Curated annotation (Swiss-Prot):
NCBIfam families linked: cyt_tran_rel, panC
Gene (UniProt): panC
EC top class named in words: ligase
Protein name according to UniProt: Pantothenate synthetase
Species: Pectobacterium carotovorum subsp. carotovorum (strain PC1)
HAMAP family cross-referenced by the UniProt entry: PanC (MF_00158)
Amino acid sequence: MLIIETPLLLRREVRRWRQEGKRIALVPTMGNLHDGHMTLVDEARARADIVIVSVFVNPMQFERPDDLARYPRTLQEDCEKLNRRGADLVFAPSPDVIYPNGLESQTFVDVPGLSSMLEGASRPGHFRGVATIVSKLFNLVQPDVACFGEKDYQQLALIRQLVRDMGYDIDIIGVPIVRAKDGLALSSRNGYLSAEERQLAPILYQLMMALSAQLDNGDRQIETMLEQTAEQLREAGFTPDELFIRDADTLQPLNTASTRAVILMAAWLGKARLIDNHQVDLTV
């Protein structure tokens, strides 16, 4: 497995594989890899001859400097895991390599609508940072396929729109959420949880599934349902951040034409911001 830190060397390897007629898959990550990331690598391996994994903690998508500073950097361990999983190349650039002129003068990519709604409304600039780094990676790697986790539901929708709007010839694959046995979605940020908080964390998943059951039973009093869930989260020790039930295809409020809903949840538990989502078929 190759470990590369510069775009020049990355392009050289990509060019060689292209000349050999290889199909290339990209798995963008911010490192601190867990089993959820490994399922992305497995999916990429099933769809391509070459698997490239990027490991880059992207400063442009952090709105809080303290959050950026404490995000875990575990490159050596990440590379060991990726080597065992069969990745072909790890691209691990520094911020100075990706943004040589600094963030203030960096050209950016913005996806109208999706960048500023829902999570984007409370995290200004976050999705601009996501769209910009993903675009840079797409330009550097020029993959045939790219794999992203469905845990970041709005991010996945944004990347799909980016690909459509910019004309990238890339298949975007959403990979289902990987969960612990108690339902908690695997996340690099779960490491921020204390032992006591880790015991409480699955409550987020449990309340999400309770909302799913209400939708299955025909309840459409969305605001009331979300208010009750927020109160239950507070009683359990969480600080609710974002709770939405939206059309799974458009991320707009549900209407009579909606056939699928998505429950989007984010809440703070101690120093960890936990996110999760679940899709519900409304036609049953």
